[in-house]
Structure formats: C-alpha cells, structure tokens
Amino acid sequence: ARPIMLLENESRVVDDGLANIILSKEEESIKAYASELVKIRNGKEDYETCLKNMHTRPYYGAMMIKLKDVDSAVGGLIYSTADILRAAFKCIGAKPAIKTISSVIVMHKDDEQLIFTDPSTVQKPSAEQLVDIAANAISFANMMNMNSLGAFLTYSTNNSGKGENPDLVREAVKIATERGLNVINGEMQFDSAYDLNVRKAKFPSAVQKEAGVFIFPNLESCNIGCKIAQRMGKYGAVGAILQGVNGAINDFSRGATVADVIDVTSITILNGYTFK
C-alpha cells in the first residue's frame, strides 16, 4: 500500500515520507470531482454545493475511492463521524443489493475478540433494518475469521419482558432465522448472550455456544455499551468500521489512540482488496 495524506494547506505538511495531496493546490481535480458528484446526486444537490463539499477532506477522499483513484481511506481525528458518513453515503453509496449501511466495532482484550453493532450509523432501526445490520456484522466476522454467531440483545430473555424494544427484537430474530442467518434462536439480555452459564439457566432451549456478534437494538445502546466496555472493562475498540458501503472507507473516534488508528487503517486496507 502507498499511503497518501490529504491536507487542506501546506502549513500542515509534515516531512514524514508520505505522499501529500494539498487541497488548496487541487482546484482542477476538485472541480472535476464536484462535477462527478453532481451526476451521482442526480438533482439532489447543485454544483455549488458539491464544489463546497469537495473542498473538505472527507468528500475529496470519498470521491477518490468512488473514481478508483485510491483503494481505501480513513479519517476522523479532526472530522466527526457524521462528516465521514455523509461523504461516504453521498459519494460512494451502498453495495449492490445492500439495503442498510451499518457499522461494527471490534472490542478486544487479551485473546478475546467481540463484535458490537451498530454504534454509529442507524439511530433507531426497524426489525428489517436490524436484521440487515446483523447480516452485515456476521459477514464482517466471517471475512475476519472471527466467531460469527450472532445474539440479538434487549432487556428481555426468552419472552421474559414486554415492550417496544423486546417486541422489535423478537421480530428481528424471527426474520433473521427465516433468512438463515447464523444467530441464536431468541432475544436475550447481555448476560445470557455473553455467559453460557447464565444462558443455560435462563434460556436452556437456546443454542449453547459462545456468541461473537452482539446486535444491540439501536445505536444509542450500542454506543453506550462500547464506551462502558472500554472505560470500565478495559477493552480495546477498533472502529467504527462501516459495513455495506461500496468502497473501503472508515472512521475512527476523535479520541482514538495511535494503536486504534493503525488497527482501523489495517482493516480498511484489507477491505480495499475486496473491491479490486
């Protein structure tokens, strides 16, 4: 891989051996990319709006991926997750046959690796969207040779609780089972999903195998769960890693460590090879 650093102006250039693209010197390519984005947006945004967006690194990098000028891109230390996601959605879009773009975070400690989804993309998914999110995460787990058994989470285990979220999650489990996804046959609280002894006591009819993919009922709960695992459980977090986008682009938290940046970049480069 040949890394390229996107910079707004020359004042941010660091002599670190990387190739640099200085946006303030790329007016011709910015105009060309903006014209392409107008075509992609198909009347939803005019040229002036696209040109303004293309002067930012998220949009310029996303368009480089779209036009195959680079294989992959990462960002997020300065720009927000929303900035990266908007650029990815508008410039690149979803893979063919993908209805829902989502994200995963790999939580890791010692030899343990778990996938949490969806921490950054779909705020309040429907049952169908939740199944799409699960399918995306399971596919990612398989690509990474990780445990891909999925567990749908809520505050109910095997019909023990009632309410909007348990009902939605039960519907998602039903749809996922009908679609043949590799998931445990019922909704669960986190303790039942994570601890086989608890699951055996609370839900003896469920699959008694360790789950590797934890599907939260909404973005809020997943995001909170990731932060609790990081800060109180001392888990490392790699991501968020976008799923379902028709190109290799990812975002890391503005609080990311050097190790986080290296991990997300490595996964993004690996993902880039799948689009060649």
Q: Where in this protein do the model-derived segments appear?
A:
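Anion-binding alpha/beta catalytic cores of soluble intermediary-metabolism enzymes, centered on
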Residues: 1-4, 8-276
